[in-house]
């Protein structure tokens, strides 16, 4: 009886190993720049509309997430740069750190 249970267990290991293959998100910023933002807002939020108005930027074609009050994160650990707010990868324009467009939150473990 033990031999039968052991053989079932051994034969089922390859099946269990292949059943756990999942795509992994690596949270890297391959396009754009890594920014540390105080908050991330929807491009349709009232705060973003006010900031864009103050900057004189048309919000017509803006979609996705927008980082608010952002500063660039350079090489991690070299200059002591840390981000205690929201690290994001931004592919769009940055307007002197006020906002950054095309942002996606990332986990950089800073």
Curated annotation (Swiss-Prot):
Keyword Metal-binding: no
Any one GO molecular function term: structural constituent of cell wall
Induction remarks: Expression is induced under conditions of inorganic phosphate (Pi) deficiency.
Superkingdom to which the source organism belongs: Eukaryota
Signal sequence, start to end: 1-19
Major place of residence: secreted
Transmembrane annotation, as ranges: none
Pfam families: Hydrophobin (PF01185)
Disulphide bridges, residue numbers: 29-89, 36-83, 37-70, 90-103
GO cellular component entries: extracellular region; fungal-type cell wall
Subcellular location: Secreted; Secreted, Cell wall
Keywords: Cell wall, Disulfide bond, Secreted, Signal
Function (record text): Aerial growth, conidiation, and dispersal of filamentous fungi in the environment rely upon a capability of their secreting small amphipathic proteins called hydrophobins (HPBs) with low sequence identity. Class I can self-assemble into an outermost layer of rodlet bundles on aerial cell surfaces, conferring cellular hydrophobicity that supports fungal growth, development and dispersal; whereas Class II form highly ordered films at water-air interfaces through intermolecular interactions but contribute nothing to the rodlet structure.
Family from the record: Belongs to the fungal hydrophobin family.
Assembly, per entry: Self-assembles to form functional amyloid fibrils called rodlets. Self-assembly into fibrillar rodlets occurs spontaneously at hydrophobic:hydrophilic interfaces and the rodlets further associate laterally to form amphipathic monolayers.
Protein name per UniProt: Class I hydrophobin 2
């Amino acid at each position: 009886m033990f031999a039968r249970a052991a053989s079932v267990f051994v034969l089922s290991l390859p099946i269990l190993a292949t059943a756990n293959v999942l795509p992994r998100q690596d949270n890297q910023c391959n396009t754009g720049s890594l920014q540390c933002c105080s908050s991330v807002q929807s491009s349709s939020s009232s705060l973003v509309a006010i900031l864009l108005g103050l900057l004189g930027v048309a919000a017509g074609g803006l979609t996705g997430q927008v980082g608010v009050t952002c500063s660039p994160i350079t090489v991690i650990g070299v200059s002591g740069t840390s981000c205690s707010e929201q690290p994001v990868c931004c592919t769009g324009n940055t307007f002197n750190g006020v906002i950054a467009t095309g942002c996606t939150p990332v986990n950089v473990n800073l």
